[in-house]
Amino acid sequence: NRSINAAERKADWWLFGGIYRPVWLEVLPQVHMEHFVLNADHHGKLQTAVDMAGDAKGHEIIVSVRSLKDGKTVYTSNGQTTITHPINNSDKEQMISGEWASIIPWSTENPNLYVAKLELKNPEGKIVQTRETRIGFRTVEFFPQDGVYLNGTKLVVKGINRHSFSVDGGRTTSAALSRMDALLIKEMNMNAVRSHYPPDEHFLDMCDSLGLVYMDELAGWQNGYDSKVGAKLVKEMIERDVNHPCIILWNNGNEGGWNTQTDPLFAQYDRLQKRHMVHPWADFNDLDTHHYPTYLTGVARFTNGYKVFMPTEFMHAMYDQGGGAGLRDFWDRWCTNPLFAGGFIWVYCDEAPKRSDKGGILDSDKSNAPDGVVGPRREKEGSYYAIRAQ
């Protein structure tokens, strides 16, 4: 498919072969929960949409919530430990709503997590399937000419872009590396991350656990997927990531790499929360995300514009000449305007794999990829400390 070649293989400095994400097969009963979407708000209300496979009439779905920290059961507002939803029809989608008492909301300062458990009971009273996922009770909202809100409080993202990259594995990463990266980003006093494609899910798990908000993006740089491929990949991305509390925004491609025909699919698949979707480096959907604005360009966008301003790339850190250099001047001035919603520095780490075919050198593809605020093995550069001090 030419659009895949354009959107992916021409969209990065490094291309690797093979399978570098987990792949598995799952055996399921004939009637089962195929997919479920959650919306847990900061007041304790939990909406659940469950897509059933097979005729589930006569089955029951049982929902319970426990604390991830100590495993204690969370009670509903009427003192019950579970919510039972009898399936009285053959509809594919089953909607379940309830309210849970005394929850602690998820936030960047206090990323409190719970585990939601869904059990499917057949007409004979036997549990035939159990699904669990971690959740955070939080509310994400976007208001035009205002900004992004988390739990009713305006959020200014102090963000950085991150490639999924390791010296020895290329695009193959590990949970340990994801944890290291998330901790280093938190140590820079940052609260947000963006990437050019859906990351390994264990990185989203770390963002959930450590309190980093995330911009989840469909791949595509300057060239987008065609509608057939794009629709499939939007569906797969959102269905995989939709229940992560860290995700606050969706991105459709990068710097022209979007297909507007797939834009409506984001709200369709994020059916309960309908989080805001943007086009990086564009005035789109009430959000100005233009990249690499100069100091005065940024000021002019506030003075003459009316859209929320959130550059999804700025302060390019090539050879550490950007990143923290001049950040205080930019940040302090831009923060004086209520339209400023924060931004994302380019980029987190140098992408330099160890080349076994070149004597073991770390190859950053000349000047294309040594653009991180940390080195390829996560060595702290000058910008790391400057950003941390901001």
Region spans (language model):
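Substrate-binding/catalytic cleft of secreted carbohydrate-active enzymes
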Residues: 176, 182-187, 191-382
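Secreted/periplasmic carbohydrate-active enzymes, especially glycoside hydrolases
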Residues: 1-201, 205-209, 214, 232-236, ...
